[in-house]
From Swiss-Prot:
This is Large ribosomal subunit protein uL11. SUPFAM superfamilies: Ribosomal L11/L12e N-terminal domain (SSF54747), Ribosomal protein L11, C-terminal domain (SSF46906). GO terms for molecular function: large ribosomal subunit rRNA binding; structural constituent of ribosome. Disulfide bonds: none annotated. Part of the ribosomal stalk of the 50S ribosomal subunit. Interacts with L10 and the large rRNA to form the base of the stalk. L10 forms an elongated spine to which L12 dimers bind in a sequential fashion forming a multimeric L10(L12)X complex. Belongs to the universal ribosomal protein uL11 family. InterPro entries: Ribosomal_uL11, Ribosomal_uL11_bac-typ, Ribosomal_uL11_C, Ribosomal_uL11_C_sf, Ribosomal_uL11_N, Ribosomal_uL11_N_sf.
Length: 141
């Protein structure tokens, strides 16, 4: 019979940098998970994506074992990396902080496709463009 799920924990952790300190430790400690076991496994799985923030969904079972699924980095993180900026605009409708090309938007949309609720790359691009607009990043043709 399948194991009974007791908790599902969602976190956003920098790739390859999971450690038992907050936010990872307290979130997993409450569920009774082996924190170091998770940290080692997560860091090994995300070592090639250094510098990005990786969303992860950790499923904890009744016997305190766990599985986890890593998602693609948030569109905002990918846009900031493509535009080479530290953070988005505080006033996106007034102050534009950077610009990205349509090709960069398409590349980000293709990266995000597995996690987006989009039927094709064009609709995924529209979602990424909306995120860019809300961050004060303009899109160049």
């Amino acid at each position: 019979m399948a194991k009974k799920v007791i908790k599902e924990v969602k976190l956003q952790i920098p790739a390859g940098k999971a450690n038992p300190a907050p936010p990872v430790g307290p979130a997993l400690g409450q569920a009774g998970v082996n924190i170091m076991g998770f940290c080692k496994e997560f860091n090994a799985r995300t070592a090639d994506q250094a510098g990005l923030i990786i969303p992860v969904v950790i499923t904890v079972f009744e016997d305190r074992s766990f599985t986890f699924i890593t998602k693609t980095p948030p569109a905002a993180v990918l846009l900031k990396k493509a535009a080479k900026v530290e953070k988005g605009s505080g006033e996106p409708n007034k102050t534009k902080v950077a610009s990205v090309t349509r090709a960069q938007v398409q590349e980000i949309a293709e990266t995000k496709m597995p996690d987006l609720n989009a039927a094709n790359v064009e609709s995924a691009m529209l979602m990424v463009e909306g995120t860019a607009r809300s961050m004060g990043i303009t899109i160049q043709d």
